[in-house]
From Swiss-Prot:
Gene3D superfamilies: 3.30.300.10, 3.40.50.880, HUPs (3.40.50.620). Keywords: ATP-binding, Glutamine amidotransferase, GMP biosynthesis, Ligase, Nucleotide-binding, Purine biosynthesis. It comes from Bacillus anthracis. Its EC number is 6.3.5.2. InterPro entries: Class_I_gatase-like, GATASE, GMP_synth_C, GMP_synth_GATase, GMP_synthase, GMPS_ATP_PPase_dom, NAD/GMP_synthase, Rossmann-like_a/b/a_fold. Catalyzes the synthesis of GMP from XMP. This is GMP synthase [glutamine-hydrolyzing]. The active site is at residues 84, 171, 173. Pfam families: GATase, GMP_synt_C, NAD_synthase. The lineage of its organism: Bacteria, Bacillati, Bacillota, Bacilli, Bacillales. Residues 198-387 form the GMPS ATP-PPase domain. It catalyses: XMP + L-glutamine + ATP + H2O = GMP + L-glutamate + AMP + diphosphate + 2 H(+). One of its GO terms (cellular component) is cytosol. Residues 7-197 form the Glutamine amidotransferase type-1 domain.
Length: 512
């Protein structure tokens, strides 16, 4: 299929920031893909990109295990922008000198622009940038000039404009680099000559055509959880092929208040999709009876879900494709190319060997924030598009220890109150994740004139970018007070509320 947008390729040399580069470029309205540094020049040529960016990385270009690229990439005649390690690699390739710095430079630095190449067009002569390197370019390759310097880095930026080659020692993709976005924009638009054309409207049009071509008159099966990824996949595919899609929604009894009903109302009634709801509460609760260990609970819930899905799928005839909500981050973090990832996932989720499906993964070029934008474009309600991250085992790991119907009801009701009050306070887009948990401990209290001995409910709320690290959310005291008063008064068998003020690390976001 012919691409309808310009593309910038990012080569991954191991930087923790490499995904940020691709995301920044997409935010400009230009499509960008991240590829391993081992990609060949021929493969890049076939993609017809407008330019290439070499990411940073933790290695030394002269050290053992140094990562290199196909040297023929430099013969493609494409603009290349090397960031940190990428600049050092370019320097080495063209005969310059890279040496170990006297001390590793990490943190903010003041950059002074000495030569206004296209990269620095309309940018201030002095700007704050983010450094993170242990090596330095100490000798320029022939044909290159110094673009910028810093106190500890005499060659903080370089260029050979005749060949459209540029390098910087700092990280423009990181927020701490105050004009970093403008610098990347200058490369994308000023050097590479890209035009804006990457947007969700364009993506939907291209992806619908691709799904129709792939599926033809065959049938597709989708496991619908009500989460944003599976919801967007289901709606997108349904828009493409209509009733050729069948969704299976497993209600394991561990969902939040009103969730099962909400899923059916939204997708079965709202989008008129063919959704098979499986009520498996009793089946799951029987398996979980007496189980206290969190890992064992996770395993039981995960395995049982597969068995239930298998049972229902086997009742359906002629299902050729399985739809999955695989995101671009899943593919990138697996360290493999898209095709290899699909191959390794032919038994998705541990499905039995005799259940062979061809995969459809329409979101596998999108980041999470882009999936939310896509969901909104497709008309999916905000409460699903902006749904809180929810673990696969559901409330099963928010009830610490053995799961009972009574404990599930306490978590379900208290969590509903928390969500309602957070939304009322206008904090639902500011806090990355918030929920209640039942630690299983009881304490003495007084309600009316009587002594009580009831459960404690814990509130967990965190701010984060990606969930890898998190800080506890500073919810205003008056909001916390409302939440506490409501839970104690409206939820049976609760007489105490505690607020978790631990960051990640050392704690995890979930309690189990």
């Amino acid at each position: 299929m012919k691409k309808q947008h310009d593309t910038i390729i990012v080569l991954d040399f191991g930087s923790q920031y490499n995904q940020l580069i691709a995301r920044r470029i997409r935010e400009f309205g230009v499509y960008s893909e991240l590829h391993p540094h081992t990609i060949t020049a021929e493969e890049i040529k076939a993609m017809n990109p407008k330019g290439i960016i070499f990411s940073g990385g933790p290695n030394s270009v002269y050290g053992e295990g140094a990562l290199h690229c196909d040297e023929k990439i430099f013969d493609l005649g494409l603009p290349i922008f090397g960031i940190c390690y990428g600049m050092q690699l370019m320097t080495q390739q063209f005969g310059g000198t890279v040496e170990r710095a006297n001390h590793r430079e990490y943190g903010k630095a003041v950059l002074k622009v000495e030569n206004e190449s296209k990269l620095y067009a309309n940018l201030p002569e002095e700007q704050v940038v983010w450094m993170s390197h242990g090596d330095l370019v100490t000798g320029l390759p022939e044909g290159f000039v110094v673009d910028a310097t810093s106190e500890s880095c005499p060659i903080a930026g370089m260029s050979n404009e005749a060949k459209n080659l540029y390098g910087v020692q700092f990280h423009p993709e990181v927020r701490h680099s105050e004009h970093g976005n403008d610098l990347i924009k200058n490369f994308v638009f000023g050097v590479c000559g890209c035009s804006e054309g990457w947007n969700m409207e364009n993506f939907i049009e291209v992806e619908l055509e691709k799904i129709r071509e792939t599926v033809g008159d065959k049938k597709v099966l989708c496991a619908l959880s009500g989460g944003v990824d599976s919801s967007v996949v289901a709606v997108l595919i349904h828009k493409a092929i209509g009733d050729q899609l069948t969704c299976i929604f497993v209600d394991h009894g561990l969902l939040r208040k009103g969730e099962a009903e909400g899923v059916m109302k939204t997708f079965s009634e709202g989008f008129h999709m063919n959704v098979i709801k499986v009520d498996a509460k009793e089946r799951f609760m029987n398996k979980l009876k007496g189980v206290e260990d969190p890992e064992q609970k996770r395993k039981i819930i995960g395995n049982e879900f597969i068995y239930v899905f298998d049972d229902e799928a086997s009742k359906l005839e002629g299902m050729d494709f399985l739809a999955q909500g695989t995101l671009y981050t899943d593919i990138v973090e697996s360290g493999t190319a898209t095709a290899q990832t699909i191959k390794s996932h032919h038994n998705v989720g541990g499905l039995p060997e005799d259940m062979q499906f061809k995969l459809i993964e329409p979101l596998n070029t999108l980041f999470k924030d882009e999936v939310r934008v896509l969901g909104s474009e497709l008309g999916i309600p905000d409460e699903i598009v902006w749904r809180q991250p929810f673990p696969g085992p559901g409330l099963g790991i928010r009830v610490l220890g053995e799961i009972t119907e009574e404990k599930l009801e306490i978590v379900r009701e208290s969590d509903a109150i928390l969500r309602e009050e957070i939304i009322k306070a206008g904090l639902d887009r500011e806090i990355w994740q918030y929920f209640t948990a039942l630690p299983g401990m009881r304490s003495v209290g007084v309600m009316g004139d009587e002594r009580t001995y009831d459960y404690t409910v814990g509130i967990r709320a965190v701010t984060s970018i990606d969930g890898m690290t998190a800080d506890w959310a500073r919810i205003p005291w008056d909001v916390l007070e409302k939440i506490s008063v409501r839970i104690v008064n409206e939820v049976k068998h609760v007489n105490r509320i505690v607020y978790d003020v631990t960051s990640k690390p050392p704690a995890t976001i979930e309690w189990e």
